[in-house]
Amino acid sequence: MAVFASKINTSSETFLRQRAEMLELVDKLNELNGRGRTISEQRKPRFDKRGQLTPRERLARLLDPGMPFLEIGNLAGYLVDTKNPAKSIPGSTVIAGIGFISGVRCVVVVDDSGIMAGSMTTAGGYRLRRAEQISLEQKLPFVHLVESAGGDLMNYTVEGFSSGGALFGALAQLSKAGIPVISILHGSSTAGGAYMPGLSDYVIAIKGKGRAFLAGPPLLKAATGE
């Protein structure tokens, strides 16, 4: 078999400069990938006070220890929520990826309620939709840890509202295809957050914590001011 040997001069000025530039970009990527986690974990005292795990803690306990978790759409929404690179939150309010639960490869979605109470942004919706597509294409069980304030009313758009129907329709398609859709309801979930468990094949609700309602008093006040 022919051997293709590299002729790169790892001591050259060009190589060293490009290597330094690439490492700088890798560090920037790692910082962006970890930004959402950092912001969410800043709310940990609030979760502790409520007797709850943080979204990442709950995800870690769900997944098989030592097995890989491949995140999907880590950079979704970067510089879309805001043009300020220092304030934009890559990944938005959703954690999505492929991991193993009891030895079974699954698509797992987590509402990151440490960021904007887990409300669904446009970018978060795209990330969730992509996870649903992968679940259908690859025939992987769809598992959703639900705690969401519903749609992002502070940045409401008609386009975002109309595209939201695809998220719920996809759950029906998964169920029709015989792919299990499982929701773990572990906090308050309003409006769209209530649709997710409502359209699931199996729902596990945490006693005293899991609540789902289409429009509770806080949502009505936020939407109408009354």
What are these regions (language model features)?
Residues V146-E226:
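Conserved catalytic cores of soluble enzyme domains
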Residues G114-A123, N155-F161:
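Flexible beta-alpha connector loops of hexameric P-loop NTPases
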Residues A2-C106, D112, A117:
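Intrinsically disordered, low-complexity segments enriched in small/flexible residues
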Residues G91-I95, R127-R130, L167, S189:
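Short alpha-helical segments and helix-capping/turn motifs at coil-helix boundaries
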Residues I95, G99-D112, R127-M154:
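A structural preference for short, pocket-lining loop segments at secondary-structure junctions
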Residues C106-V109, A117-M120, L140-L145, G178-S189:
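A short, small-residue-rich loop immediately preceding and capping a beta-strand
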Residues S92-A96, R105, L140-P141, F168-L171, ...:
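Short glycine-rich loop/turn motifs
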